[in-house]
């Protein structure tokens, strides 16, 4: 993934695997061999209401906590908390209100479609919340599709001093990925049990 990012002109990435920091820590270590490339570890925490990006942490945060408690744990670890894709279909509507307890809102997600990103932009602007963007990459071909441009990611996000960029991930590639996820879930956890 690092080589794909470099190939697309990206000079750093925030790696946030679901509910654990391991991928980010491995990526941070792997990035040492590349000059002028930085990996910031984190996790995409599954709170009771939806996903919260924990950026800049190196210790896991338990899942299924309230948004408020999730944010508190992230802050205790020195990280920042971003409401991830608050208007996607996978998120409970309560996150849309609770995301104002976070440090910022992901307003562009390369895998969202329809009004989800537009609604997130409106929520962030209306409430004066810092905005972020992300590829939400689950495979190498979407790395670098969206992100932030800044000098000091953690502090610049906190202050709302980032520029965003983004294009949508290919619908075809997303469908293939989602089909593979579904097939894997059915094999590993059959619905009839």
List where the protein language model places each region:
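Charged catalytic cores and adjacent phosphate/nucleic-acid-binding surfaces used
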Residues: 1-4, 22-30, 34, 41, ...
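Divalent metal-dependent hydrolysis catalytic cores, especially in the metallo-beta-lactamase
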Residues: 2-19, 80-82
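Short glycine/serine/threonine/alanine-rich loop segments
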Residues: 10, 37, 79, 129
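Short, conserved beta-strand segments within well-ordered enzyme catalytic domains
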Residues: 14, 38-40
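Active-site flanking residues adjacent to catalytic metal/cofactor-binding acidic residues
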Residues: 16, 43, 84, 135
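Short beta-strand/loop segments at the ligand-binding rim of alpha/beta enzyme cores
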Residues: 36, 74-83
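Short acidic (Asp/Glu) patches
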Residues: 64-67
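Aromatic-lined carbohydrate-recognition surfaces of secreted/lumenal glycan-active proteins
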Residues: 82-90
């Amino acid at each position: 993934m690092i080589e794909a990012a470099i190939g697309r002109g990206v000079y750093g990435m925030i790696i946030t695997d679901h509910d654990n920091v391991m991928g980010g820590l491995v990526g941070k270590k792997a990035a040492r061999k590349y000059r002028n490339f930085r990996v910031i570890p984190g996790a995409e925490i599954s709170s009771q209401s939806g996903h919260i990006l924990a950026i800049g942490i190196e210790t896991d945060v338990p899942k299924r906590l309230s948004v408020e408690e999730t944010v508190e744990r992230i802050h205790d670890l020195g990280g920042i908390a971003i409401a991830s894709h608050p208007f996607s279909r996978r998120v409970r509507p309560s996150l849309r209100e609770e995301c104002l307890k976070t440090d910022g809102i992901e307003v562009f997600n390369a895998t969202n479609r329809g009004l989800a990103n537009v609604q997130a932009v409106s929520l962030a602007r209306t409430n004066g919340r810092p905005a972020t963007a992300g590829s939400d990459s689950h495979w190498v071909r979407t790395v670098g599709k969206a992100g932030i441009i800044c000098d000091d990611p953690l502090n610049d996000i906190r202050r709302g001093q980032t520029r965003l960029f983004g294009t949508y991930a290919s619908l075809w590639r997303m469908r293939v990925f989602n089909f593979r996820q579904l097939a894997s879930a059915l094999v590993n956890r059959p619905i009839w049990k």
